[in-house]
Amino acid sequence: MANIRKTHPLLKIINGAVIDLPTPSNISAWWNFGSLLGLCLITQVLTGLFLAMHYTADITLAFSSVAHICRDVNYGWLLRNIHANGASFFFICIYLHIARGLYYGSYLYKETWNIGVLLLLLVMMTAFVGYVLPWGQMSFWGATVITNLLSAFPYIGDTLVQWIWGGFSVDNATLTRFFTFHFLLPFIIMGATMLHLLFLHETGSNNPTGLNSDADKVTFHPYFSYKDLLGFTILLAILSALALLNPNLLGDPENFTPANPLVTPPHIKPEWYFLFAYAILRSIPNKLGGVLALLLSILILVVVPVLHTSKQRSNTFRPPSQTLFWILVANMLVLTWIGGQPVEHPFIIIGQIASVLYFMLFLILIPLTGWLENKILDWA
C-alpha cells in the first residue's frame, strides 16, 4: 500500500512542496531566507491577530488602547514588542532574500521574481499603514507626509489624497481604513506567497553555481527542513533578545507622544527599513519627480531580468559583477543613513550622488559589465 502522504489529495500537495521536493544539494544558507520570511509572516499574523483583539481604531482611543495592551493585557507588552520588531526582521529577511536573488541570478525565473516584487510592495504597504495605528506623533505626521505625496500627480492628485484621507486631513476616517487595510493585506500576502511558491516549484530552486542541478538533487526533508530549523532558531533567538532586552532600539521616541496636528516633529522620518527609498524621494527637488523616483526605486527590480546580459546566470564566477553588487549594497546602506539625516549640507549632495548611482548600477553599469565579461570570455 502506498504511503498516505503520496496518495491523499491534500497531503500529496504538502508532500510535493516541503517533504519530497527535489532540492539542489549545494544550496547555501542564503536559501534559508524564503522559509524565514514564512516564519516572519506567521509570527506577524498571530501577534497581530491578538493585538487586534485589544486595539481600538479611533483617534481618541488608539494611543490609549496601545498603552492598555502594554500595561493591562496578559503579555500584551510582549505581543506588541514582537510585532513591532518582527516587522524589522521581516524587512531584514526580505532585503537579504532579494540580494540573494540578485547575486545568484534567481531573477531569471521571471514569474517567481515578479510575484516577489509584488509581495515586496504589499509588505511595504502593510508596514506603512501599520505604523500609523498607534497614533503617535510620527504615526500621524508620517501618514500626512507620505499620503500627501499623491497630490503631486497632475489633475487627480488633490482629489486622490482627500479620497484616501476620507476628509480634508488625516483624521478618524483615515485611521479606521488604515486599520482595515492592515488587517486585510497580510491575508492577501499569504495568497501571493502561495503563488510565489507555486511558480518556484514549476522550475525548482536555483543554486549558487547558476547551473542546472537536475543531476544532483536531494529531498527537502530531512536535509533542508533541519537546515531551515537552525535558521528559525537563530532568527527567533535574536528577535526574542531584541523584543525583551531593547524593544525600542529601532523605534522613534517621537511616537511615545500622542498625535498632535498642531505640533510638527523636528524631523519626520519613516521606520529604518524605508529610509533608503525616503532618501531617494528627498534627493529630487521636484515633488512629482521625487514620487516617481520613489516608485521606480522599487519597481526597477521588475526590469532586472530584462537587463541580464551575461552568458552566466550567477555572479559566483564573475568578479567584476561581484564588485558592482557589493557597491550596490554599500550604496543602499549610504542611502539608509542619509534618509535618517536632516536635509542640509553635506547630506543633500551625498543623497543625490547615492540616488544617481543606485539607478546607474541597475540600468547601465551591471548590464554593461555583464556584456564586457562575455567579451572577455570570447577573447580568452
Curated annotation (Swiss-Prot):
GO molecular function per UniProt: metal ion binding; ubiquinol-cytochrome-c reductase activity
Gene Ontology CC annotations of this record: mitochondrial inner membrane; respiratory chain complex III
InterPro entries named among the record's database cross-references: Cyt_b/b6_C, Cyt_b/b6_C_sf, Cyt_b/b6_N, Cytb/b6-like_sf, Cytochrome_b, Cytochrome_b_C_euk/bac, Cytochrome_b_N_euk/bac, Di-haem_cyt_TM
Binding site for heme b b562: H83, H182
Classification via SUPFAM superfamilies: a domain/subunit of cytochrome bc1 complex (Ubiquinol-cytochrome c reductase), Transmembrane di-heme cytochromes
Keywords from the named record: Electron transport, Heme, Iron, Membrane, Metal-binding, Mitochondrion, Mitochondrion inner membrane, Respiratory chain, Transmembrane, Transmembrane helix, Transport, Ubiquinone
Annotated localization: Mitochondrion inner membrane
Similarity comment: family membership: Belongs to the cytochrome b family.
Oligomeric and partner information: The cytochrome bc1 complex contains 3 respiratory subunits (MT-CYB, CYC1 and UQCRFS1), 2 core proteins (UQCRC1 and UQCRC2) and probably 6 low-molecular weight proteins.
Protein name: Cytochrome b
Lineage: Eukaryota, Metazoa, Chordata, Craniata, Vertebrata
